[in-house]
From Swiss-Prot:
Biotechnology: Can be used for genome editing.
Binding site for Mn(2+) 1: D502, D571
Domain remarks: Has 4 domains; N-terminal, PAZ, Mid and PIWI. The N-terminal and PAZ domain are joined by linker 1, the PAZ and Mid domain are joined by linker 2. The domains assemble in 2 lobes; the PAZ lobe consists of the N-terminal, L1, PAZ and L2 domains, while the PIWI lobe has the Mid and PIWI domains. The PIWI box is exposed on the surface of the protein. The PIWI domain assumes an RNase H fold and has the catalytic residues. The N-terminal and PAZ domains are relatively mobile and move further apart when in complex with RNA.
Region: Mid domain, residue numbers: 335-448
InterPro entries cross-referenced by the UniProt entry: Paz_1 (IPR041659), PAZ_dom (IPR003100), PAZ_dom_sf (IPR036085), Piwi (IPR003165), RNaseH-like_sf (IPR012337), RNaseH_sf (IPR036397)
Presence of keyword ATP-binding: no
Enzyme class: hydrolase
Alphabetically ordered keywords of this record: DNA-binding, Endonuclease, Hydrolase, Manganese, Metal-binding, Nuclease, RNA-binding
Residue span, Piwi domain: 419-694
Gene3D superfamilies named among the record's database cross-references: 3.40.50.2300, PAZ domain superfamily, Ribonuclease H-like superfamily/Ribonuclease H
SUPFAM superfamilies, per database record: PAZ domain, Ribonuclease H-like
Protein name: Protein argonaute
PROSITE patterns in the cross-refs: PAZ, PIWI
Amino acid sequence: MGKEALLNLYRIEYRPKDTTFTVFKPTHEIQKEKLNKVRWRVFLQTGLPTFRREDEFWCAGKVEKDTLYLTLSNGEIVELKRVGEEEFRGFQNERECQELFRDFLTKTKVKDKFISDFYKKFRDKITVQGKNRKIALIPEVNEKVLKSEEGYFLLHLDLKFRIQPFETLQTLLERNDFNPKRIRVKPIGIDFVGRVQDVFKAKEKGEEFFRLCMERSTHKSSKKAWEELLKNRELREKAFLVVLEKGYTYPATILKPVLTYENLEDEERNEVADIVRMEPGKRLNLIRYILRRYVKALRDYGWYISPEEERAKGKLNFKDTVLDAKGKNTKVITNLRKFLELCRPFVKKDVLSVEIISVSVYKKLEWRKEEFLKELINFLKNKGIKLKIKGKSLILAQTREEAKEKLIPVINKIKDVDLVIVFLEEYPKVDPYKSFLLYDFVKRELLKKMIPSQVILNRTLKNENLKFVLLNVAEQVLAKTGNIPYKLKEIEGKVDAFVGIDISRITRDGKTVNAVAFTKIFNSKGELVRYYLTSYPAFGEKLTEKAIGDVFSLLEKLGFKKGSKIVVHRDGRLYRDEVAAFKKYGELYGYSLELLEIIKRNNPRFFSNEKFIKGYFYKLSEDSVILATYNQVYEGTHQPIKVRKVYGELPVEVLCSQILSLTLMNYSSFQPIKLPATVHYSDKITKLMLRGIEPIKKEGDIMYWL
């Protein structure tokens, strides 16, 4: 691994000696969402790796049976008839190749053997001992088949770690200190992760239920667990059963919660990060080792995998200059700290009325807070903004609960201010599943009044040099009060507006009850023009036509005229119905549209010793690109985004250059961000909304989420 940028993508071919496949077809139409479940059961029953081609199931080899009867987990029986034998002449798409490849991995157990060997060898190194528990980092090998621009298949092979406690969900539920609703869990011995929808006691069900579950189970671990529950009445008295969102039911004894960084204590989080954020060279060597094991195990079955990584196709140029209100500009290479010290913001409000709240256990840091406020006032004064302190409140509290009780009357009295600055104590960490966070409470209560807040943790004031904290806070104060720290000098191509749109599902009691489309509209200078929240009954992950229509109505209201070029960034997949609605309203309002999907997770990685890799790209097709959007300033391996143009006229390279420019628009820190401003913070906004933190007014131009 040198200066060039490699990707964990490997050319893959399937050239079996025996090209005979047995083809089965259902006697009745199968619902689309059940097709993969049926395919999996065809593989289990025949023992032959299988892929699906439309409504046919192709088995790699000869099957003598004329009819297959497959029982799904819900008890439904699917009948397949043998159509005959066909000669395999190649895959028609990536999915077919991926399905067959994964079945061969299961058949040879090469993947399971690697994970088992790795865990045994490095168990001590990938186990984290917290204060009250042990945490295991379980290796996960992920495979996905993609297609290159040239038309050959590529194996995307990656290694990650799943964070989970040693205890099963059953143990945690027995202790009654864990709310499992909506958490992700993984069944032991099953390559699947799902979200918890419901939990109930096993004793509520009769023996017939357990017998049917045992018979329908397709994995040894779950079949054994159901068998034990069927035989042991005492076990059923205390056992919990868990229903996942996709309808699967499992005994809690074989489920392990999948933790996130938010679920970890600080010391746990740091230790986990040291392991998970693996040095790029080390990660690549491990991937190569896994690949060699795959090659050896699958060679005799006709699989040929190149040992060579694919290489980046080139490096995109982009407009990387920002400017201030006086026309001073700078090229952003690493960060914006020096520019922020000297720049003159675009001032929309030059006098800010501010309320100060200080929450502490003791008074000893109050002098430090006063010192910090003086520096903040002077800093903003030099920027042309007067900070006018309307009032101050000091709250001394020994616990989070006491602090909340004392905060309520203070917050209730606040009105007619532009911002509330809150110095906040960090009380002992709580379980986020069952306790409130003081930060959430403050943010939520002030947003009910449509007042933005700036929270400063008391511990940050213990730093000897407050300049870093001061700059960061000042930048956010500007953005939260409608003032603009800086703008883009220019951007590639002619664009009038960028629209970032995402959908989050709001859950109550484990059930999705409504969805919120979050829209952010930016002008060609990267300046936020408006955010807009629209809520409607949930229909999976899709945007409704009404939500899309609202975006166009808002664009017109904001003054974007017919003929305007509108570039839409969808955080995630654009569905066919969504594309049709965008095109319909684009024509209706007379806008020229570019529709892009931005996929931020589970993409191939770039590996390079070069620090400045922002702009490297790999084209999967004429309209699909893997794009490096930041330089190697962080630990760990670079995680690029995937950009796919779904509709429009501009070349995907121009659209990617625009994305690179929009990564400079970050008002919450000095570093450019991984995602363009259009979709950056989508995850945070969603999490805030799930915790009840959202503005009363669903439309505005204040970045309350910073």
